[in-house]
Amino acid sequence: MKPLRPLLLDEMPEEWNLGEGPDYRRKQIAEWIYRKRAASIAEMSNLSAPLRRHLETAYDFTALKLARLQGSGDTTRKLLWELRSGDYVESVLIPASPDLFGGRSGRFTLCLSTQVGCAYGCKFCASGLEGWKRDLTAGEIVAQILETERTANTRVNNLVFMGMGEPLANYANLMRSLHIINAPWGAGIGARHITISTSGLAPQIRELARQPLQIRLALSLHGATDEVRGQIMPVNRKYPLAELLEACAEYQEKKGKMMTLEYILIDGVNDSAEQAEILARHARRLRAKVNLIPYNTVEGLGWQRPGEFAIDRFAAVLRGAKVTTTVRREKGHDIDAACGQLRLKQLKTDAGANRMDG
């Protein structure tokens, strides 16, 4: 069976219109899928019975199912999805979260995954501990939004591509999903409510700059010099800071939007005053905001978050250099909301069950 959800409007078969005018039924079907967030084809009540039967027999409507749901004391919800392939990915729903640019907000933000695992091997991250397995399809990316809304009984209105995987390494499916998410016939979420976070794939940043959508960009920097960044982010060997920051400058110039430099603070690794001073120079060059993220510990990794004094000192250096700076107090700390942790627990559970079955 073919997946129904990743179809673009102009890809839906013309015979669905049943002679009732261009795009008539296709728009109805798209509205049921993306606007009304139908849970099944059977809910599409204004379609003819023969058309519903055809859709049910020829198309697969469910790209993923909920495997685990964890709630945090701060109302963050972490969702673990099982894909039809048997793989797992995570999404995180963050109610009433402040936006990345410092404003207060009552939005419901959803953090999306784009890959099963990750190939980029950032030393502090749980997503890459099991390596990269495959890219998500556009349908699997969009389904995270629709199924989260159904599970939480709320409408998501802000998206951040900061979950498992490197979004720009799955560029074609990312752009296809964005087309569906942003389109009036699709999920209808405006581009200015969408942020893509990247570990620093310079060519794809330049390609994204040429796209018409006014999407926000967040760079996972985490080190202000090649020496420090290279220790914890292997991608820096392929795209060192000079090349990466030049690509970001091109993006900022073409889009005219403030971008964010994300910086996870790790005790004794990247939290020195010298790193803060160099980071401030990068931020001023790009006219960027800095989002400091005290490290969210990951089981099996030895990194630690700095103490409050070191965090405040680092932020003070940036603010003293007139760089807009926020310190993000991680949400979902009590539910392992750092990328990939819930998936790793599920994989260990499955492995234990398999050993017992054997």
Predicted regions and their residues:
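Residue-level structural signal for beta-strand termini and adjacent loop
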Residues: L93-I94, N173
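Conserved alpha-helical substructure of the radical SAM core
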Residues: L129-N158
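Canonical Radical SAM [4Fe-4S] cluster-binding loop centered on the CxxxCxxC motif
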Residues: P98-E140
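A short, flexible beta-alpha/helix-coil linker loop
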Residues: K36, P98-D99, G128-W132, T225-D226, ...
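Conserved AdoMet/S-adenosylmethionine-binding subsite of the radical SAM
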Residues: E147-N158, G163-T326
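Auxiliary Fe-S-binding modules of radical SAM enzymes
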Residues: M1-V89, P95, A249-M258, Y263-G358
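Generic beta-strand structural signal
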Residues: R77, V89, R107-L112, Y120, ...
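Short, charged, solvent-exposed linker or helix-capping segments at domain edges/interfaces
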Residues: S91-V92, G102-R104, Q231, A351
